[in-house]
Swiss-Prot record:
Disulfide bonds: none
Binding site for heme b: 63, 92
Identification of the protein by name: Hemoglobin subunit beta
The species this protein was found in: Chloephaga melanoptera
Tissues with expression: Red blood cells.
InterPro entries: Globin, Globin-like_sf, Globin/Proto, Hemoglobin_b, Hemoglobin_oxygen_transport
GO function term, MF aspect, one: oxygen carrier activity
Length: 146
């Protein structure tokens, strides 16, 4: 994947403003609420019975932070995303059996969360760069499935 200097700047510039705990928790909660079938991968998280329960669930918050923290690894390694996510791809494929489509859904939700949090900064050019990034990350995570 080739990144232009402008794309790299748009991604890293916005990432520097992201509150990983809050945005991660919101993104994962939205995934579980908007796409309820994804909840089956989180049965051990306890009460996911309503949007309020999901949003207030400490395990959802913690895992959302973990997910977005690892997304930060992509931002730090834009030129080597495939290798950055090779172990996570293996885990999600071989052990957790997560449908790779869920990575794309989470990426789309992350775009929505970023747009909501950073209305001024999230220009169309910024969105295009982030859309490319979430697509590349989703593809890297789905790699072990092929």
């Amino acid at each position: 994947v080739h990144w232009t200097a402008e794309e790299k700047q748009l991604i890293t510039g916005l990432w520097g403003k992201v509150n990983v705990a809050d945005c991660g928790a919101e993104a994962l909660a939205r995934l579980l609420i908007v796409y309820p079938w994804t909840q089956r991968f989180f049965a051990s998280f306890g009460n996911l019975s309503s949007p309020t329960a999901i949003s207030g669930n400490p395990m959802v918050r913690a895992h959302g932070k973990k997910v977005l923290t690892s997304f930060g690894d992509a931002v730090k390694n834009l030129d080597n995303i495939k290798n950055t996510f090779s172990q996570l791809s293996e885990l999600h494929c071989d052990k957790l059996h997560v449908d790779p489509e869920n990575f794309r859904l989470l990426g789309d939700i992350l775009i929505i969360v970023l747009a909501a949090h950073f209305t001024k900064d999230f220009t169309p050019d910024c969105q295009a760069a982030w859309q490319k990034l979430v697509r590349v990350v989703a593809h890297a995570l789905a790699r072990k499935y092929h």
